[in-house]
UniProtKB/Swiss-Prot annotation:
Name assigned to this protein: Uncharacterized MFS-type transporter YuxJ
This protein's record includes keyword DNA-binding: no
Keyword Cell membrane: yes
Family: Belongs to the major facilitator superfamily.
């Protein structure tokens, strides 16, 4: 599963650094048009994924996660393959929309491994799995940038599609899902309404889901614009490659500490680690807005990645601890929905802010989002401590 996550993450991030550059080649557009449509094309995938992911989650509970992994992987591969043939931004938008219907390979793999992991070691295990995704996101943008500069965008789409389909074969022949029949036999069937009611009556769960949305909104607000920002700092020479470096710097930082943050969360509490990581992420975004050179941007993208690497594994582990086993799969599925919602809102937010102000302004707004997330989690912690004190 680690290898499959690595290949899928590497392949999908191969096309991200030059997506806005690809739009520019489709016609003669203004900068504002490219910035807006970079956000739209980037975000529509995750809007569709947000709408359909609860159905994938329920299907996984009933039929198994492996089938979802194979279906989503094949769909992603086909969608990216046909992107190499588009002649307009609207065709690209439609294919990204179709891709959203089957996007969810990596979140589904996290849900599958989480459901089969003891709660006491959930953070460390998910952090290890996260390293596969992060490793792929580290090498993917660099490889995609080099391929795009050398062979062009079209062949890069074809290569990406082939690698993702190889991951599907890896899951088919190399992954064995444990159905845990002895546990599922004791479970009670809950309706979707009952599961939602449970979530809404347990703040520890829905606050974590809101945090997932905030984190993804902040992280994805700048990603479609990063190539344009690198162009402002460095110029057009080998732009796809240096844009890939900016993406990979974040991945390298995450790779170094993803497993460590999960381990610390298991030992000292996931919420405590999350507050520190959110504050650090907020702090490291501000210098990116003030960067005067590509090297400065790369340094702080790397530092941001060190904080970012532990956020989603700690949140998933915290939900894993809080949710009863009988509804755990579906609860994690709703968290995936909030994750995709953040993936939708982020590019839209970044595109709107950058087109009306500057790309630098997007960094400031993102820093505020991470800071707000830390404050929200701290307030929840304080309220829980006060309620425990009154009860005792």
């Amino acid at each position: 599963m680690w290898l499959a996550n690595f290949f899928v993450s590497a392949s999908t991030t191969m096309i991200v650094p030059f997506l806005s550059l690809y739009i520019e080649t489709l016609s003669s557009f203004s900068n504002g048009f490219v910035q807006r449509w970079s956000g739209y094309v980037f975000g529509i995938t995750f809007l569709m994924a947000f709408l359909v992911s609860p159905f994938w989650g329920r299907f996984g509970d009933k039929r198994g996660y492996k089938k979802i992994l194979m279906a989503t992987g094949t769909g992603i591969a086909l969608s990216i393959f046909f992107m190499g043939f588009v002649t307009s931004v609207y065709q690209l938008f439609f294919l990204r929309m179709a891709m959203g219907l089957v996007t969810g390979f990596i979140p589904t793999s996290l849900a599958m491994i989480s459901a089969q992991t003891p709660k006491s070691s959930a953070g460390k295990t998910l952090g290890t799995l996260q390293m596969g995704q992060v490793s792929g996101s580290l090498f993917g943008p660099l490889l995609g940038g080099m391929l795009a500069d050398r062979f062009g965008f079209t062949y890069t789409f074809f290569i990406t599609s082939f690698v993702i389909f190889s991951s599907v074969l890896l899951v088919l022949f190399g992954v064995k899902e444990k159905h845990l029949a002895e546990k599922t036999a004791k479970r009670t069937s809950y309706s979707r309404k009952e599961v939602l009611s449970y979530i809404f009556h347990h703040p520890a769960l829905w606050v974590m889901m809101l945090l997932t949305m905030l984190i993804q909104t902040g992280n994805f607000s700048i990603q479609p614009l990063l190539a344009l920002y690198v162009n402002e700092l460095h110029g057009p020479v080998n732009l796809a490659f240096f844009s890939g470096m900016a993406f990979s710097a974040t991945g390298l930082g995450s790779l170094l500490l993803a497993r460590k943050w999960g381990d610390l969360g298991d030992r000292y509490g996931h919420r405590r680690i999350l507050i520190g990581l959110l504050l650090a992420a907020s702090f490291f975004f501000i210098p990116q807005a003030l960067a005067s050179s590509l090297s400065v941007l790369l340094v702080f993208r790397f530092l941001f990645g060190m904080a970012m690497g532990g956020l989603l594994p700690c949140i998933t582990a915290a939900i894993r601890v809080q949710a009863p086993g009988s509804i755990q799969g579906e609860v994690l599925g709703y968290n995936v929905s909030f994750r995709f919602l953040g993936n939708v809102l982020g590019p839209l937010l970044g595109g709107i802010i950058s087109s009306h102000f500057t790309i630098s302004a997007t960094f400031y707004v993102t820093a505020f989002l991470f800071f707000a997330g830390a404050c929200m989690l701290w307030i929840m912690q304080k309220l829980r401590k006060d309620s425990y004190a009154k009860a005792s």
